[in-house]
């Protein structure tokens, strides 16, 4: 594994980039800032192709509001109203998405420099979020491990707390298997027969709605451009897909299929231990520098806004417990 100085924070703190290489040709570049995946090169007939959106220097990441390639936490996705109640006590959070908290608040995990250590084959990144950070209770120690395994990128997440809290971790890589252009010609399948409809703030209503007979039925390979403009109220709310698909009723100890994407000779399979995956089609990318819908995210996670929905799988983490999950991105020829 190689490393180099990627840039410096405004206070002068160094940020390093680490390059993981597999003999089969898969290469990943990960930076300490936000534990972000800055590039992922996949072997193709003509050489290699970078299939994620990212920057070559640190400065654009410091101004990035799209969470490009970042680990999102301590609570990925949205919490309605920027508040929740746990064990009878209400906690008020920093809000950064209207009146709601998105991806952990104004200064979530994506905006911190993580400690990094390598054993030569994997990269372990650690971040300690203090009690009260963005309003969340408990000191939370989070570790994310990146490793390459043949044709796959494997990401493991682990977290521990010293006081009851809520945790939802995900990865916000934007994929474009063509390496350029929009993702409208990408074909996708999602292994879910239900999804979570949302309100105007993109907060789940609490319903688990069957996908059958709707624009959200992606159980078979479907060209994104053929579905994203369907006459569907939910698609209009999100400006496209920005919805959570239900994979299982509870986390699984072993990875299960979540999604499959194909474009320009590359197929990507996503497998996870998590109960859901958020499909986001880059509807809010503004064109500086990445244009509208030029990347798609498959954010494996627990359900958004779970603290307000007792019927959803719990995201509560207590002292003595360990949060753990794994997501695998496997690549091959289409």
List the predicted regions and their residue ranges:
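An exposed, glycine/acidic-rich loop-and-rim segment of catalytic or binding clefts
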Residues: 1-334
